[in-house]
Design a protein with these regions (language model features):
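Glycine-rich beta-strand-centered segment in the early N-terminal region that forms part
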Residues: 24-40, 53-104, 146-150
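Glycine-rich phosphate-binding loop and adjacent beta-alpha segment
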Residues: 248-325, 351-359
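Adenosine-nucleotide cofactor-binding segment
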Residues: 177-186, 198-259
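NAD(P)H dinucleotide-binding glycine-rich loop of Rossmann-like/cofactor-binding domains
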Residues: 97-184
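Short glycine-/small-residue-rich Rossmann-like dinucleotide-binding loops
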Residues: 41, 76, 93, 230, ...
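C-terminal capping/lid region of NAD(P)-dependent oxidoreductase domains
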Residues: 2-4, 215, 238, 271, ...
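N-terminal Rossmann-fold NAD(P) dinucleotide-binding loop
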Residues: 190-191
Length: 359
């Protein structure tokens, strides 16, 4: 029986302690691609899951990680896009039903009938899905992506969740040169939103509560950087923005959503992509708060088309995320620092359980 190895949560009371375990991969099918993992980004989702911020982890042991780069070691007989030895990536989704209207229309990331998350999920064959803090992974070819040569593996890794999560709503909402894009929160997601919006030619407004990040946001490409410490921070920007990407916890009662909406131009869009630990309802709003013509919405990762377009843009515009590499054996340090807000702006773990040929 084939076994992979990974750094896994085994005791929920010690959420950041990850031990090396062996686990069974999914059965290999005709549309599958197997890769030996070289890099895996550390996502906020990993921390929320490990620390049970989104609820009980359930099945243990659990290997997290869904910002994966690796080298193809095996392809199914239906796979033509990928070859053994090729460098590829995998993000937060590794399967869908591939039959529903959404899947057929290029919206497989919104599949309601067969969504399979990269970890903490189950394959149709009943095997528990383990993530990328590991030696290898298998996925349906629809959820595997070719990495352009111009993008280094350490830079590509976190694009497959954090990058895609903010790029997809920018692309799908028609951001182009001159579009006024606001980014609320300059963390792992927000820094990518600034980088990609700037690469798309947008006029970027970066909003952050951290004074230390104001200069960083400028270096990332923001034309305007705004501290949100002042309660009236939004007033100079009322009616100014075409789209506002929010990466923060807008569900906290002390964060007035209606003030964010007020910064939108008529028919401007507020897109929430932040998924905090809290399960609070939306802050109090009234029908009158929407009379400015604002649209309130969300977004979930991205499709294959979105991801390929993102990678092409990153290669063409030399988009460089701010990352720090650590060996996988230091995953404990990485997840603890992410939870404490100490990372600037993404960690990427490098393989140290088993060397990868061709890496």
């Amino acid at each position: 029986m084939v076994e992979f190895k990974g750094y896994a949560l085994t005791d929920p009371s010690a959420w950041s302690t990850l031990d090396i375990v062996s686990f069974q991969p999914k059965n290999f099918l005709d549309d599958d691609v197997e890769l030996a993992i070289t890099h895996c980004g550390v996502c906020g989702s990993d921390v929320h899951t490990l620390s049970q911020g989104w609820g009980s982890t359930g099945t243990l042991p659990l290997v997290v990680g869904h910002e994966i780069v690796g080298i193809v070691t095996r392809v199914g007989k239906n796979v033509e896009e990928f070859k053994v030895g090729q460098r590829v990536g995998i993000g937060a989704q590794i399967g869908s039903c591939m039959k529903c209207k959404r899947c057929k229309n290029g919206n497989e990331n919104y599949c309601n009938d067969g969504m399979i998350d990269t970890y903490n999920s189950y394959y149709p064959d009943g095997v528990f899905a383990q993530g990328g803090y590991s030696t290898a992974i298998r996925a349906h070819q629809q959820f595997v992506f070719t990495i352009p040569e111009a993008i280094e593996s350490k830079d590509a890794a976190s694009m497959f969740c954090a990058g895609l999560t903010v790029y997809a709503p920018l692309r799908r909402n028609g951001v182009r040169p001159g579009t006024k894009v606001g980014v609320m929160g300059i963390g792992g997601l927000g820094h990518y939103a600034v980088l990609f919006a700037a690469a798309m030619g947008a006029e970027v407004f970066a909003f952050t509560h951290s004074a230390s990040k104001l200069e960083d946001a400028k270096k990332m490409g923001a034309k305007h950087v705004i501290s949100t410490h002042d309660d009236d921070f939004y007033k100079p920007y009322v009616g100014e923005l075409d789209i506002l990407i929010s990466t923060i916890d807008v569900f906290r009662p002390d964060r007035p959503l209606k003030t964010y909406l007020s910064m939108l131009e008529v028919h401007g869009k507020f897109i929430n992509v932040g998924l905090p630990d809290s399960n609070n309802p939306l802050p109090e709003m009234h029908a009158f708060d929407l009379l400015g013509g604002a649209f309130l919405g969300g977004s979930h990762i991205g499709s294959k088309d979105d991801c390929n377009a993102m990678l092409q843009l990153a290669a063409e515009k030399n988009v460089k995320p701010w990352v720090e590499e650590l060996p996988m054996s230091r995953a404990k340090e990485a997840v603890e620092n992410v939870k404490a807000g100490k990372v600037r702006y993404r960690y990427v773990l490098t393989q140290d359980i088993a060397p990868v040929a061709g890496a």
